[in-house]
């Protein structure tokens, strides 16, 4: 009986490791005003197409700002932007690789921030629920 329980525990543990939900951002760096960067967010452990995915940034003054969203497949991956980045930033997905992107153009000093990829916890059924999965972020510095 004890051996059987050990196997159940091991299989449960391995399943948990295999199914860990996570997002990992990359692509930040130093860029001059007017320049461009593309951020990436590699995701794993969940069905990427089923969820709204968002980009949020935190400025050096520690203010959090939602900036862009890509809705779920059920909502045709429609995109939304904050007024501060609309027309300059483009959010997109590679569903085959489960990667979210943020193309950032015409960068300004005020775009300096740590950028976070987040998953909307509401499973694509309502817009702007709460964000249950966050990455460690990637830092963008816009300076000459």
From Swiss-Prot:
InterPro entries, A to Z: Ig-like_dom, Ig-like_dom_sf, Ig-like_fold, Ig_sub, Ig_V-set, IgHV
Its GO CC terms?
Answer: extracellular region; immunoglobulin complex
Q: Which residues form the Ig-like domain?
A: 20-133
Range of residues in the leader sequence: 1-19
GO BP annotations, alphabetical order? immunoglobulin mediated immune response
Drop me one GO molecular function for this one: antigen binding
Quote the record's miscellaneous comment: This chain was isolated from an IgA myeloma protein that binds phosphorylcholine.
Q: What is this protein called?
A: Ig heavy chain V region M167
Q: Where is the organism placed in the taxonomic lineage, from the top?
A: Eukaryota, Metazoa, Chordata, Craniata, Vertebrata
């Amino acid at each position: 009986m004890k051996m059987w329980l050990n196997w159940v525990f091991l299989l449960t543990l391995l399943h948990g490791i295999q199914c860990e939900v996570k997002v990992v951002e990359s692509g930040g760096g130093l860029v001059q005003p007017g320049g461009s960067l593309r951020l990436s967010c590699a995701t794993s452990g969940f069905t990427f197409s089923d969820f709204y995915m968002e980009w949020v940034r935190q400025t050096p003054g520690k203010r959090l700002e939602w900036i862009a969203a890509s809705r779920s497949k059920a909502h045709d991956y429609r995109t939304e932007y904050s007024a501060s980045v609309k027309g300059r930033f483009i959010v997109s997905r590679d569903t085959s690789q489960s990667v979210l992107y943020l193309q950032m153009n015409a960068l300004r000093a005020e775009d300096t921030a740590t950028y976070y990829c987040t998953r909307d916890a509401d499973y694509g059924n309502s817009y702007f629920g709460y964000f249950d999965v966050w990455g460690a972020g990637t830092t963008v510095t816009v300076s000459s």
